[in-house]
Amino acid sequence: MVGRLTHVDEKGVKMVEIGHKDVVFRKAIAKGRIRLRPETIKLIREGKIEKGNVLATAQIAGILAVKKTPELIPLCHPIPLTGVDITFEFGEDYIEATCEVRAYYKTGVEMEALTGVTVALLTIWDMVKAVEKDEHGQYPYTRIEDVRVVEKIKTYSTQ
């Protein structure tokens, strides 16, 4: 089915029928980065951001976003998730977020992983915007970049 649009036919847009598919283990991992000034990274590491714990807030927001993916992206199926993990790694001038989503279902969870990582990064931006703004109220350094799916797994049972 590579190259064929499954959400569109001659009648218009539709949610793809997945009733005939087998329930199998699904996992997707998405990553993305937010570029921040090194001074902001230091404040986050030291827990000195006024709004509170940046990474804990971003984790919670990302997990909630994963659960709400079908409400945000209209043609995504509601999926009974079995687990979501959001982790962070620091660089000198960035934080890389990773969102891993797992489920046993009939369709993949890559959109959920992308939604989770993106909302986690947006939440970091929101938490640090007061210290990232320049004297004109702009964000010349701050940016979200390189959001992508790094792994997608579909495992059939060997029983």
UniProtKB/Swiss-Prot annotation:
Annotated metabolic or biological route of this protein: Cofactor biosynthesis; molybdopterin biosynthesis
Reaction equations catalysed: (8S)-3',8-cyclo-7,8-dihydroguanosine 5'-triphosphate = cyclic pyranopterin phosphate + diphosphate
Alphabetized InterPro entries for the sequence: Mo_CF_biosynth-C_arc (IPR023047), MoaC (IPR023045), MoaC_sf (IPR036522), MoCo_biosynth_MoaA/MoaC (IPR050105), Mopterin_CF_biosynth-C_dom (IPR002820)
MF-aspect GO terms: cyclic pyranopterin monophosphate synthase activity; GTP 3',8'-cyclase activity
Any single GO BP term: Mo-molybdopterin cofactor biosynthetic process
Domain of life: Archaea
Top-level enzyme category: lyase
Alphabetical list of Pfam families matching this protein: MoaC
EC number assigned by the record: 4.6.1.17
Entry keyword set: Lyase, Molybdenum cofactor biosynthesis
Residue numbers annotated as active site: 126
Ligand binding (substrate): 75-77, 111-112
Coiled coil: none
Entries under PANTHER family matching the protein: MOLYBDENUM COFACTOR BIOSYNTHESIS PROTEIN 1, MOLYBDOPTERIN COFACTOR SYNTHESIS PROTEIN A
UniProt similarity note: Belongs to the MoaC family.
Self-association and partners: Homohexamer; trimer of dimers.
NCBIfam families xref list: moaC (TIGR00581), PRK09364.1 (NF006870), PRK12343.1 (NF008999)
Function: Catalyzes the conversion of (8S)-3',8-cyclo-7,8-dihydroguanosine 5'-triphosphate to cyclic pyranopterin monophosphate (cPMP).
UniProt protein name: Probable cyclic pyranopterin monophosphate synthase
Encoding gene, per UniProt annotation: moaC
